[in-house]
Structures are given as structure tokens and as C-alpha cells.
Amino acid sequence: MKRFSFCLGMLLISLLMEAKICMPAYFSDYMVLQQKSVVQFHGRAASNREISLSVGWKKQPYTVVSDAAGCWRLDVPTPKAGGPYEISISDGEPLTLHHVMVGEVWLYAGEDHTLLSLPGVSDPEVRVLSVKPSIALAPQQDLPEGTEGWKDLSAEMTTQIPATAYYFACQLHRTLKVPVGLVSCVYPHTPIEAWNSFEALEQVPGYEEHTEMLSSLGFQPDKIEAAYARQREAWFQDLYTHDMGWCNNHQVWAEPKYQDENWKTMGLPGAWETQGLPNFDGVVWFRKTIDIPRAWHRKQLALDLGPIADEDIVFYNGKEIGRGQGDGRRLYTVPRNLVRRGKAVITIRVTNYEGEGGVLGMPDDMQLSVKGKKPLSLAGEWKYLSGLSLSGIAPVPISPSCDPNFPSGLYNALIHPLIGFPMQGIVWHQGISNLENVEEYADLQLSMIADWRDKWQRPDLPFLLVQQGSYGMAAEPADDSSLPFLREAQAAALMMNHTALVVTTDLSLQQATLQQKAFDKGFRLVQASLKQAYGKKRLPEFPSYLNHVVEGNMIRICWKEVGKSFAPVEPLRGFSVAGTDRVFYPATAIIDKKEVIVHSPEVPHPVAVRYNWADTTPGNLFSTSGLPAVPFRTDHW
């Protein structure tokens, strides 16, 4: 990857006025600096000017001379926790940072966006830097425009950061009794590949084409945008190529004489997911034959179809009369030269990329009319046939400048500017947006952790990972679901040192309020941080699978990190077993001291066992410390 020099990167920090010191946004009033670390104060000033930096915990100032481009840097050791301090930077014109604390600084990153309004909150020793969500094609040197700097924790700030982050910071402060700084760096509904740097993606199989493209284009935004435009155009052309209703650039299924007797029927308006096409994304053609009254002959018609998700092409007797996209109502005009009395065929080609698809809205939205006459309702039964399923083609290319899913886009904008700012550790709360490519998740997560540690030059930088909790309503074993596999991939990070997994499968929506869930996750994160970052080694952990032994028609499961014993409970839920046919059945489970024995009458010869292998997890196995067991499986089917 092309390396940008330090001074060239500094040019991107902000507009610079002569003789005025400019620094990255995380150097501000109310900031918290990591105690007993070395902070790299840096920025720009006038060229060849002596820079003086005074800190409240040291009598003698630090000095350096800016280079020809005005770039300067000073490495300043920080003391143990304390404050408030003032920090003054001057090149002849002073800039003073007020109310600076020294304590513990943590980065909270990912896609968690559970925001709660918590009135009455105020804690001057907990400070928050909420990073403005943004994306970038190349690594940035300063935080996104709109990032306002550090703030005291207040009721207003709780609506700007995830509730789990808030409870983590507050409980950490109360536990350690030192100032805490939280850098909140979240972007909802984003996948892990967007948080990986270019260098990290180079280490992950399957991203060779992406990284080679960026490298060959020199990371130049205009060239990357042009390449994306070509890819997107080619992708949409492929939709027509593979659409069975579109042959040799001709809309075969829109022709009025096309024989549609074997097509199924669907009531419109209405989402097709509830009418025979569940979980379908792709192209569906709709046809309806109507009678045009004699009085309408050779008159211009108004065609109202209501809202359509997501895109549509509309034909009247085989002739295209309009196209639409987005959520708006579809209003089209049928030219008078196409209108003849008698039979006419209206055809709608609908393309849906995600979510509900079809002709939506209300029955009164669908009508054909001529000025001064009673409209003809088009609601009711339509013939339909799918022309293309998107499950059979590559995903649509991701916009590099507009889509936060673009690989490396969030790392470039949100994480890279923070590199070098000392952190005690990182909380990673992300995952649900990777259900479509869960098989890549473990590699992406491991590469990201190693890369961030390398860039911070902290091979022991603690990573606390929040495992995805319950999702949806179904509590049955989920053989085809991606969510259990995501949890398994998240747990793979435990093979790296100084990592911790915070299990949340017991915190379902049915069992706790959002506020209580956030509080519990925050508490568990603090416990994990005490062990990984602060040397408290004797704290309880989440029980996890160690091994198992088949004993006749039963399986005996051995665990680690149980503590004294499991908490007694009847009935014990969440286990399933399978034989060589690989069909899993719910299992009866009993606790035997620090082990669990499972069996099922449907499986006389069990070979595999799973625990909490479902979207919404029913398991109730806890240690006596109140920590839930980690979901697992013994098979690799």
C-alpha cells in the first residue's frame, strides 16, 4: 500500500492559518490521557517555528522546532491517574487545553447502536469522545469533520453513545476509582470487513481481488469511483442477462401474446414474502390482462401503481412506459397511441434487493384512469413468475464513497486517525451484519485484532469481544441459521492472548429491558477488563466446553472455568444430540458436579452434542457466579 508521509497526512487535518497551531480533534478540552503512557502530541504550525508544550504535571516545558512544512511532534510521558490539568502549546501564540484528566482510556468500537436516554446522569470523571460516523477511501490523519472533542458524561451524552459503552465506562470508574475516558467509535449495521485495514484484508483469503484493485489504482478516489461505476454497470447488465424474462435485450415476458397460463397468481398490492416467495430477493414479473372501454380508445391514460420495492420497469402491451426506484409512489402515463379498446396487458418487472419486495401500498393506490372517467381498479389477482434469484449471483458492488460496508472504509475514517493515541484496551461489539458471510468472520476478526495491535505497537493490547446475543423469536435448534456459526467464529478470537469473550445469550429481549441488558453487558465487560488489563486473575469466567465422552446412550460433557460448580436448575435446557444420521433432537440434561450428562430417547447412539445452537437461545446453564455457559458444538457438520 502506498505510504503517506507524516507531513502529507497532516495536511488533511484541517484548514491551516499562518502562525496558528492545529492539532487532531482528540486533543481538546476535557480529554483523558492514558496514565503511565507516552502521548504523541503532534500537529502543524508555522514552518521552522519553536513549539513549546507545557503540561500541568511537569515544571519544565517540552520544546521542538517545526519543520519546513510546519509539522511537529513531542512525545510526553504521562503520570499516574489524576487531574484536572491544563496543557499549553505555543509557537508564540498559545493554545491551552483545559480540564484535562489522566486515567484509563478505552476504545469502544463496532456496530452497537442501542442508545438510551438516561436523565440525571452526570459524572465529571468520566469523559467521552464520540467519533462522528464517516467513511474514507484512504487512511485519514484526523477524525471526521463534526467530531466535537471530549465531553463530560451527561444525560445529553448518553444519547450519543451505546448504552453498553456508558455502563462499561461508569462501572469501570467506580471500580478503579480513577478518571475514565471512552472513545466511542460506532457505525450501525456495518460488517467487520469495513473495520479492517487494507493490510489486514491482505491476510484474509477471498479479498485478493479487492486489495489488488485498490493497490493497482494507487488508492486514488477518482479512479476507485470510476472502477466502481464500471463494476456496478456490469452487475446490472448481468441482471438482464440472467433474467429468464429478458432474452436478447428483449422483454419476452412483457409481450401481450406471451402465454402465461402456467404462471401462479398473487394478490396485489402485497409483499411477495407472504404470498409464496418467502425470503426471496431478485426479479419477479407480474402480468394482468384488462379490458379497455370503448370510450378510452386513443386517449392518454394515467397508471397509478402505488409504492414498489425496490425498482420497477412497467410495460403496456409490450411497450415500456416507465421506470422507478425508491420508496415513492409510481405514477406513469400511457401514451394515447398505445391505447386501443379491448384487451390490454400491463406488465411490471420488479427487482428487490433486500427486505420486503413487490407492489406495496393500499388497494386504492392501484388504478388505471382517463381524465373525466371512473378509474379502473388494478388491485386483485395478478399472474407472476420469478425471473431471477439474487442468491445465484454475486452481490451488488459496494459504493466506495457512499456505502459504509465498503471494506476498509470505516477503518480509514474512524480507526486510523486514533492510531498512536494511547489506549488501555478495546471493546469490540459487532457481528450481526456478517450473517451473510459468516464463514469469513473468524479470519477477518483475527486479522483485525493482530493488525490493530501492530499499528498501536501493543502486542498485548486487550480486546474484549461481546458475543452476539439472542436474535429473533424462534428458540428451536437452528440447523440452517448463520447466527450460531457467528457466535462460534467470534469465540475463535480466544485463541489469541489477552482476549476475552463476553457471553450475552442469556440476555434476550423477553428476559430483560434494554437498559438492564446494557447494564449487565457493561458489568461483564468490566469484569473481563479487570482480568485482561489490570491483573485480577482470580475472577470468575464463563464456563466453556472442554471435552466429552460417550457413555452408552449418553454423552458426558466436561467443562473449564466452572468455578465451584454449576448453579442447580431443573429442567436444564438448551442441549441437543445427534447420531450418525446428523439429525439433532432436544436432549434431557442433568448436572453432575462440574459436568453435564445429556441423552435423548430418539438418539440411542449419540455422537455429537450442541448447546444453545439457535438464534434465540433457551439454555439456562450457569456457574454459581451467575455467568452463562458459552454456546458450543462438538461436530463440524
Q: Which residues fall in each region the model found?
A:
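An acidic-aromatic loop/edge-strand motif
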Residues: 95-152, 185-272, 343-412, 418-421
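Short beta-strands within extracellular/lumenal beta-sheet-rich domains
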Residues: 25-29, 280-293, 330-332, 412
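Ser/Thr-rich low-complexity repeats and stalk/linker segments
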Residues: 20, 26-104, 356, 587
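Aromatic-lined ligand-binding clefts that engage carbohydrates, nucleic acids, or primary amines
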Residues: 263, 290, 296-318, 346-348
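Beta-strand-rich ligand-recognition modules
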Residues: 58-82, 314-365
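Short, aromatic- and glycine-rich surface loops/edge beta-strands on solvent-exposed regions
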Residues: 82-92, 345-348, 606-614
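Surface beta-strand/loop "capping" patches
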Residues: 34-41, 278-281, 302, 520, ...
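C-terminal beta-sandwich/jelly-roll accessory domains of carbohydrate-active enzymes
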Residues: 556, 562-637
